[in-house]
Curated annotation (Swiss-Prot):
Cofactor note: Binds 1 Zn(2+) per subunit.
Subcellular locations according to the entry: Cytoplasm
Enzyme class at the top of the EC tree: transferase
Name this polypeptide is given: DNA-directed RNA polymerase subunit Rpo2
Family: Belongs to the RNA polymerase beta chain family.
Species annotation: Thermococcus celer
Length: 1122
């Protein structure tokens, strides 16, 4: 361990905190999605269009080339045809998609001559809120408020059909990078590479089997091919060329001799190609086989290296590098690669995923254009086509092809390639849950398999991925969240970096082969050349980056051991990086002057990066760094200094005060429940029309806070209240995590909230000119509910605001045309139509007051009504509460204030929790928070409980003593019922408690009678469908065990699906009853006399019917009851 040198500490943790605040002020909290989306609209769309180049219809000497693409401003087309500007709140209220038109320049080419270009709208692209293309971009708080937006809303999501949807980042293995590992079960060593080009992903593996022979697995080839065959197919014919393509190291070459000997039967390129062709197309003529093999090695083998014939040599060298790594691992010259190391991971953000989607959607549009052009040419002939070529091109485009494909994927989350759940409905429970959802990272691994290593916390997650915030259950460790200071790269063009490296003196791989004395240089996973002085080369790159000569996106790492010397330069997108302060000669480059300049606003975060004071490191480069945790720990050996250890946490985990004093799982539960707490989630709740939402009436800022709360905006949008809490067992009503609440506190408004629910109804149009109508239905109409359900409606069929409604009350009266056109002839031959009752009603289990009614139009011009109801939620038995330390519980008793215990100073607690919940869970942080909250309330100041740098416990205890209380937080208490002093002192403090959205009012359910299923005639399932309670197999077994036969009959027959069936005593078949003629007969044997009525479960009758459908004849044998 490095010795601590006599370091002069210029900066304190408070100074570093100012620097971190400068980062959030400039970058925001969802910058990763915004940067990615902006990169997509700036150059990603153009790249995809350039990949296609143009469209070649089946018309002689005619093609259309694609030019520049541009994105318009968000707008929408009214039903009447005019296009109007569109703002996000309009899109939410009117169920529109917040999108902008895409315009593409099309250049017709006739006989090789380019004609006048025409710009055409090719479709609509959903716009990410607060991105460059959004109408909210760069607006002040006042302007946002005028547009109905919450100024604290971070953006980073889309609005599709009125719903807010977020694209969740996907974590994947780095493309185009080789990883080697041992397969112990099959005794193989494998090098894998996921080669990625233009949306196509191909897995190439090189493996060494136990006999020492190397094989290559190629896409679309069923069996592995010998490595030497593939090298010959790529054009390396002599043994010397193949050996040199791998390595100059004699140890490696010696192992390769066996491979060359084993493959000596194939010596020419044609033989090697034919061998691959035979595997891929057995039984086909040689000409086809050769063409197929050439297609495989050009297009499917390592496509990222190129798809032309001239790229084959580069591919051979890449395969040689893969073989070299396999052989080095087999000889013990290198270790296995760790695929969970974050240097080997890349995140696919909104921009990358939209690019994949846009590529597929645009491909469909190009195919459709080709079809439309060819069809028009064939139908209308050459004269029409070339008379007005611009008109011909414009008419061949159907913008809906592109728009609908993109919109459907965003609305459902189903992405090309079979991925599901890519876009999700944005979580709006509270402000923190929204931020957390926008910073979520999900892994594509299967939830069913253990994947222990993938779920584990890895050392390289430090400062990049939150160690605390992950769900419980099957997603544990696979769904993660970004840490506070994570930054994700957007990428630099590789050609620029390659040119820069060549200027620094890199010898290309084609000119000099690697040997043990040279440093191998990899650019984004591809071996590009060799360097003689590795350390000097790496230092030069770092110096140029810090001085601003090259992009700060570039990272470089150097790995050296006895046998392998490698340099990795990374400039690709999707790398998770974190900022660190540079340390030179044992002194941090951040000085007091910098801090003062940040304080007075003359210096920004970006300035510090440009000045070379701070730099971003990816997980690869951090392997070369020695990072000091605190300024006073910096020594000569250190290369960097942490900005703040608390920044390793994510946003919800940062809200937990004193997390370092809790058991790790408790912080995970605390972070999870912070996302379920009620508060002021958004300031524009009066005009929002979310399907459901909660609002706490009097949210408070925590007395024991974390500095990060202010930085992320939690203090403006809090979710919780400060409760006076006593830790006391009280008559057993708070055992098993239950809590006891003070009735008077509840009556004064403690933890009171309102629940909002929005219902919507639309006047739909049907084929044949039929429409829905908003009106008070006529009593004669089919399905009329009864007069009392329509009592609140106005004459237009829409309810009055502030009407009190109960379950099944009608909010919007509506009638619809018949589902099937059963036209009935009325008097005098006039056709009458029987309309149906399809009114919008309140959910059966809910009550409330109509809060607002919005009447508007959809994009199709149909009338749309949205009705929001509100319901006052006063804490009651069974409502769930939780502290920020994962201590959750439900209300077990509500006690009048006069019966509650009180302290010597007359304080009556709001909440009593059981002491048994503390020792086994080790939530010491909650106890320190209680003492801190007590100090804060007595002194009228906030207490800092930030992770690792919070106010020390000793200081808080000392302050309590100065205030005249015991330093332990315990107090003498008196029983509210007897008035006697309690024997033990009771721990009393102030703790920030959160009310969670799990409430009894939303879950309580019972039924006596109600709807049944059509098929089984058994009660429906679930509260929403007024379902019954399931009496399952285990419950049945209990009653059988007790011998309670009558109770069994009651539960399983009388209360469920009892039915009476006529059964023929002669043949045992179910008989038929002809009610019109008043007789019962057996359809099988014709029996009319010996037929009896039998009680049975309808499910049993259904079983009999299904057996008959299978061709099995069940027969019931009847005997008389005794």
């Amino acid at each position: 361990m490095a010795s601590r040198g006599p370091t002069v500490v210029d900066v304190t943790p408070d100074d570093l905190w100012l620097v971190m605040e400068a980062y959030w002020k400039e970058k925001g909290l969802v910058r990763q999605h915004l940067d990615s989306y902006n990169a997509f609209i700036d150059h990603g769309m153009q790249e995809v269009i350039d990949e296609f180049g143009g469209v070649k219809p089946d018309i002689p000497d005619f093609e259309v080339k694609f030019g520049k693409v541009r994105l318009g401003e968000p707008e929408f087309q009214e039903a009447q045809g005019q296009r109007k500007p569109l703002y996000p709140m309009d899109a939410r209220i009117r169920n529109l998609t917040y999108s902008a038109p895409i315009y593409l320049e099309l250049i017709p080419v006739v006989n090789g001559v380019s004609q006048e270009a025409v710009e055409v709208r090719i479709g609509e692209l959903p716009i990410m809120l607060k991105s460059k293309a959004c109408r909210l971009y760069g607006l002040s708080d006042e302007e946002l408020i005028k547009l109905g937006e919450d100024p604290k809303d971070p953006g980073g999501y889309f609005i599709v059909n009125g719903s807010e949807r977020v694209i969740v980042s996907i974590e994947d293995l780095a493309p185009n990078k080789t990883l080697v590992e041992r397969d112990e079960r099959q005794n193989r060593i494998i090098a894998k590479c996921f080669s990625y080009r233009h949306g196509y992903r191909a897995l190439i593996t090189v493996e060494r089997r136990k006999d020492g022979i190397l094989y290559v697995k190629l896409p679309n080839v069923p069996r592995p091919v010998k490595f030497v065959y593939v090298m010959r197919a790529l054009g390396l014919l002599s043994d010397r060329e193949i050996v040199e393509a791998v390595s100059d190291d004699p140890r490696i070459q010696h192992v390769l001799f066996d491979n060359l000997e084993d493959a000596s039967d194939v010596t020419t390129q044609e033989e090697a190609l034919d061998y691959i062709g035979k595997l891929s197309l057995p039984g086909q003529p040689k000409e086809y086989r050769l063409r197929r093999a050439q297609n495989i090695i050009d297009n499917n083998l390592l496509p990222h290296m190129g798809v032309e014939e001239k790229d084959r040599k580069a591919k051979a060298y890449y395969l040689g590098m893969m073989a070299l790594r396999v052989l080095e691992l087999s000889l013990g010259l290198r270790g296995e690669d760790d695929k969970d190391h974050y240097a080997n991971k890349r995140l696919k953000l909104a921009g990358d995923l939209l690019m994949d989607l846009f590529r597929v959607a645009f491909g469909q549009l190009v195919k459709d254009m080709q079809y439309q052009m060819t069809k028009t040419y064939q139908r209308k002939g050459e004269r029409y086509t070339f008379e007005n070529i611009q008109r011909f091109v414009r008419n061949s485009i159907r913008p809906d092809v592109l728009s609908e494909r993109i919109e459907h994927a965003l609305a459902t989350g189903s992405w090309p390639g079979g991925r599901t759940g890519v876009s999700q409905l944005l979580d709006r429970t509270n402000y923190i849950s929204t931020l957390s959802h926008l910073r979520r990272v999900t892994s594509p691994l299967s939830r069913e398999q253990p994947h222990f290593e993938a779920r584990d916390l890895h050392g390289t997650h430090w400062g990049r991925i939150c160690p605390t915030e992950t769900p419980e259950g099957p997603n544990c460790g696979l769904v993660k969240n970004l840490a506070l200071m994570s930054q994700i790269t957007t990428g630099v063009p590789e050609e620029e970096v390659r040119e820069y490296l060549e200027r620094l003196g890199v010898v290309p791989i084609e000119e000099r082969r690697p040997n043990p004395d040279l440093w191998r240089l990899y650019l984004n996973g591809v071996l590009v050349g060799t360097v003689e002085d590795g350390e000097g080369f790496v230092n030069r790159i770092r110096t140029d980056r810090r001085s601003g000569k090259i992009s700060d996106i570039i990272n470089v790492a150097l790995y050296q051991d006895e046998d392998v010397k490698e340099i990795y330069v990374n400039s690709d997108d999707g790398r998770v990086r974190r900022p660190l302060i540079i340390v030179e000669n044992g002194r941090p480059k951040l000085t007091r002057e910098h801090v003062e300049a940040i304080k007075n606003g003359s210096l920004t975060w970006s300035d510090l990066v440009k000045m070379g004071v701070i730099e971003y490191l990816d997980a690869e480069e951090e392997e070369n760094a020695l990072v000091a945790t605190w300024p006073w720990e910096v020594t000569e050996e250190h290369t960097h200094l942490e900005l703040m250890p608390a920044a390793i946490l994510g946003i919800p985990a940062s809200l937990v005060p004193y997390p370092e004093h809790n058991a790790r799982p408790r912080n995970t539960y605390g972070a999870g429940m912070a996302k379920q707490s009620l508060g002021l989630g958004w300031a524009n709740f009066r005009i929002r029309v979310d399907t459901r939402g909660h609002l706490m009436h009097y949210p408070q800022v925590p007395l024991v806070n974390s500095r990060i709360m202010k930085a992320v905006g939690f203090e403006e949008r809090p979710a919780g209240q400060n409760f006076v809490v006593a830790v006391l067992s009280y008559a057993g009503y708070n055992m098993e995590d239950a809590i006891i609440m003070n009735k008077a506190s509840i009556e004064r408004g403690l933890a009171r909230s309102t629940f909002f629910r929005t219902y919507e109804a639309e006047e739909k149009r049907y084929l044949g000119g039929q429409t829905d109508r908003f009106e008070i239905p006529d009593p004669t109409i089919q399905g009329y509910l009864g007069e009392r359900y329509y009592r609140h409606l106005d004459e237009d069929g829409i309810i009055f605001p502030e009407s009190k409604v109960n379950g099944k009350d009608v909010l919007v009266g509506r009638t619809s045309p018949p589902r099937f056109l059963e036209e009935q002839s009325g008097l005098g031959g006039i056709i009458l139509q029987e309309r149906r009752e399809t009114s919008l009603t309140v959910r059966p289990s809910e009550t409330g007051v109509v809060d607002k009614v919005i009447i508007t139009e959809t994009g199709d011009g149909t009338k749309l009504v949205k009705v929001t109801t509100r319901d006052l939620r006063i804490p009651e038995f069974g409502d769930k509460f939780a502290s920020r330390h994962g201590q959750k519980g439900v209300i077990g008793l509500i006690v009048p204030q006069e019966d509650m215990p009180w302290t010597e100073s007359g304080i009556v607690p709001d909440l009593i929790v059981n002491p048994h919940g503390i020792p086994s869970r080790m939530t010491v942080g909650q106890l320190i928070e209680a003492i801190g909250g007590k100090v804060a309330s007595l002194k009228g100041r906030r207490v800092d409980g930030t992770a690792f740098i919070g106010e020390p416990e000793e200081k808080l205890r000392k302050e309590l003593e100065e205030l005249g209380f015991k330093h332990s937080g315990r107090e003498v208490m008196y029983d509210g019922i007897t008035g006697r002093r309690l024997e033990a002192d009771v721990f009393v403090g102030v703790i920030y408690y959160q009310r969670l959205h799990h409430m009894v009012a939303d879950k309580m359910h019972a039924r006596s009678r109600g709807p049944v299923q059509v098929l089984t005639k058994q009660p429906t399932e679930g509260r929403a469908r007024e379902g019954g309670l399931r009496f399952g197999e285990m419950e049945r077994d209990v009653l059988i065990g007790h011998g309670a036969a009558m109770l069994l009959i009651e539960r399983l027959l009388e209360e469920s699906d009892k039915t009476e069936v006529w059964v023929c005593e002669n043949c045992g078949h179910i008989a038929l009853e002809d009610k019109r003629r008043g007789k019962v007969y057996c359809p099988v044997c014709g029996e009319e006399e010996r037929i009896s009525k039998v009680e049975m479960s309808y499910a049993f009758k259904l079983l009999l019917d299904e057996l008959k459908a299978m061709g099995i004849r069940p027969s019931l044998k009847l005997v008389d009851r005794v």
